[in-house]
Amino acid sequence: MQLFIILSLAFIAAWVVYSRWSEYSRGRQGGSGGLPPGPPRLPIIGNILQLGRDPHKSLAQLAKTYGPLMSLKLGNQFAVVVSSPEMAREILQKQGLIFSKPFTPSAVRVLGHNDISMNMLPASSDRWKKLRRVAREQLFSNPALQATQDIRQERLRQLTDYASRCCAQGRAMNVGEATFTTMTNLMFATLFSVELTQYGATDTGSDKKFKEHVNALTRYMGVPNVADFFPFLAPLDPQGMRRKLTYHLGSLLELVQSLIQQRLQARNDSTYQKKNDFLDTLLDLSEGNEYDLSIKEIKHMFVDLIIAGSDTSAATTEWAMVELLLHPDKMAKLKAELKSVLGEKSIVEESDISRLPYLLATVKEVLRYHPAAPLLAPHAAEEETQVSGYIIPKNTKMFINVWSITRDPSIWKNPESFEPERFLDSEIDFGGQHFELIPFGSGRRICPGMPLASRMLQCMVATLCHNFDWELEKGAESKQLQREDVFGLALQKKIPLRAVPIKV
């Protein structure tokens, strides 16, 4: 048992033992009082210990016993875990407005981010509606993405050039770091028309610090926090989560603020030439009357985009390469398709994607087998409601266990096997309408950056597979292809994939 749990329990035991004992008895009955069934609860802590280090896997195992709508008591907090497409549809679509309020972890309520971030505002708020409209119409619409296609093509060329340098030197490439650099530079070029990181430089200096900030935020925002289970402990910050997130989030906010300030000064110059980037687009909007957009809102929105865009797509591409190296027959099929369609062309263009069905099937299977967000960002019930005949009290924390849904043998044939072929003759897509595959969420709170992430995932996988064969770094072959992951907002590979590119 971790030290913070021991200390926290010692602090609160005298206060709550008696009052919680009655809940222990009721919790053993499973589903009594109209609540969804769930595992027995211990006094005081409820089901906290059953989360374990990998909550997505622990909760999936519990759901096999207690069903696709399962209740838990996490300290003072009542929670419900959804583990089926039918229940996910009910929560995200049919009763989407009731469950559209995000659950904001205690540690993230820092620097005003929870009052401004689109990810943390209730969907019923005017600010959320405004920011969502900006993202949908100005940043991720088809015309906006078409206008920035050249930026993505250039980043794919840079990724190819870096892999070629590794090939010429006969050295292994850290696939996760290389794709992280690609996505980071893509995001900063798209947002600010600048490049932030260099390939192979994430072990030193500012590149290392930036990666630390992003990785820390995606990890700490997702891990269980005792201050959420017992809110009266939040001011004490027993795990130091608030302190850590204040530092890492503050560092990114300062970086973005400096870039915005530089642009504002440049725009005051009469000779300034507008750039084809999101910052100028949103600054123009902030000067108009249609959106009433503030500089502070732009800053926090960009930080959200950087965190989501840099880490999750890089992690998913790394998992794709792991699976393709584990399955040489699948790699061969993909390379044959790429050769047939692309020929001698080294960089896949987005217009090529529609002619690459096995590539799309491969990406879908990676998103099924390794969903970037194993537990979708939790929602909270804005009012008491009923789901499948069970009462869901107001403020219940709702988890959608995407990882469990994508490993369910009643939904997927051979779910533990990596089989892109399952999607070749299937209409199932990850756009939010097929609830057996919702890695980007669904309904009102579906990830607004999904169109960009989808394009880059397919293009990065195609670029790495079409131009190179791959050999694992000598001496650690068995560890390189292990599927052990690290839980957080994004599911990271525990042991990075390092492989030597060989020019085709």
Swiss-Prot record:
UniProt-recorded Gene Ontology molecular function terms: heme binding; iron ion binding; oxidoreductase activity, acting on paired donors, with incorporation or reduction of molecular oxygen, reduced flavin or flavoprotein as one donor, and incorporation of one atom of oxygen
Superkingdom of origin: Eukaryota
InterPro entries: Cyt_P450, Cyt_P450_CS, Cyt_P450_E_grp-I, Cyt_P450_sf
Positions with a binding annotation for heme: C447
Pathway where it operates: Secondary metabolite biosynthesis; terpenoid biosynthesis
Function per UniProt: Monooxygenase involved in the biosynthesis of carnosate, a potent antioxidant labdane-related diterpene natural products. Catalyzes the oxidation of 11-hydroxyferruginol to produce carnosate. Mediates the conversion of miltiradien into miltiradien-20-al. Also involved in the production of pisiferic acid and derivative products from ferruginol.
Name used for this protein in its record: Carnosic acid synthase
Species assigned in the record: Rosmarinus officinalis
Gene assigned in the entry: CYP76AK8
